[in-house]
């Protein structure tokens, strides 16, 4: 980890302690922070398929084979993560939805991911947790920043959640 990254993490920790930010992580002591983790089991339906966590959807996208993908989709949280990490998607920078390829850096993929998180936000419990963060800045410092090495960067993740939260707040 670079010095710049260490300083950034310390700064974010300070913001969290002051109550101005949330660093989303499964190991956080902050309930909203840990519940917003992609590993947390929140049931939702997306494009006709039922999921038990957003992580199962994200990890399943790495599998080209539909049967393997559906198997990953059926897992929860870390179990899905363990299965998905075996897929070498980054070699071709391609992800899949039921046999349909999507380039990692494409607008199609970005829109797909946004749509998936909006579907997750239909879950009442998830929505309440997201709204409980108020106007705090969302971070995910455990996440990677290079989109060629991760299917969802920290910036993508937090931007989508902030967008959904803002939309939900204005609907109230």
For every predicted segment, state its role:
Residues 1-172:
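Charged, low-complexity intrinsically disordered segments
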């Amino acid at each position: 980890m670079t010095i710049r990254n260490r300083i950034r993490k310390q700064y974010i920790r300070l913001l969290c302690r002051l109550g101005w930010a949330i660093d989303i992580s499964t190991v956080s002591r902050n309930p909203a922070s840990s519940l917003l983790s992609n590993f947390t089991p929140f049931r939702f339906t997306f494009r006709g398929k039922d999921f038990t966590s957003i992580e199962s959807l994200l990890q399943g996208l790495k599998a080209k084979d539909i049967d393997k993908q559906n198997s990953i989709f059926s897992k929860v949280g870390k179990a899905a993560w363990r299965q998905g990490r075996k897929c070498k998607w980054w070699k071709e920078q391609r992800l899949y939805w039921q046999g349909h390829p999507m380039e990692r850096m494409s607008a199609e993929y970005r829109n797909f991911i946004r749509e998936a998180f909006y579907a997750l936000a239909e879950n009442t419990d998830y929505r309440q947790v997201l709204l409980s963060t108020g106007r705090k800045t969302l971070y995910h410092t455990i996440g990677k920043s290079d989109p060629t090495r991760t299917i969802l960067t920290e910036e993508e993740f937090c931007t989508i959640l902030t967008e959904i939260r803002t939309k939900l707040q204005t609907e109230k």
